[in-house]
């Protein structure tokens, strides 16, 4: 994965026509996509705004701030224990249950259901995905995310992104895109392949 190429292709997305963008990336052996803000959009200016809705359902006034803090605290605990900050939704909600008394299982279910309900496809990228699919291209998904695989797979299914060869989620590996470790795993798994990434990091 060449950073300069990936950054250039990300800038091209949405500027070029779908056909021109596909033409620029179709000769790579493997095409990697980020999920959120690339394949998938949320109807908020900030991803944490979804916590307002979850707080309303729990009738918990200061839920957003508590949810943000619980994630930060879970990451700090994970860093101390494991040397990285990639946490799962369960890690976060166990913190919340301890601090607020809210039921972790119910909270995780509600957060996933809310994300699944609100997320929608980036129409440009969905066309790109479908076009590459028709060409028989190998496509993978790489995401720095705390949501569980089951939730992410349902979001992708609902929004029309089917047929990914592999889905890499940071909280399953304790590695992330931002630090490069998750991309190194991808490169090892697809040894010798020419790979391009569409999204952030790199």
Task: Annotate the PLM regions.
Residues 14, 82-141:
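Short, acidic loop-to-helix structural element flanking the phosphoryl-transfer center
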Residues 36-40, 45-46, 145-149, 173-175, ...:
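Short, solvent-exposed loop/turn segments at secondary-structure junctions
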Residues 21-68:
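Active-site neighborhood of HAD-like aspartate-dependent phosphohydrolases
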Residues 118, 123, 129, 155-172, ...:
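Hydrophobic, small-residue-rich alpha-helical packing segments that form membrane-like cores
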Residues 1-33, 194:
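Non-catalytic pre-domain segments flanking phosphatase-related domains
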Residues 100, 133-140, 145-171:
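Substrate-recognition/cap helix-loop segment adjacent to the acidic, metal-dependent catalytic center
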Residues 179-202:
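Conserved Lys-Pro-Asp/Glu-containing loop-to-beta segment of HAD-superfamily phosphomonoesterases
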Residues 65-93:
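N-terminal accessory alpha/beta regions
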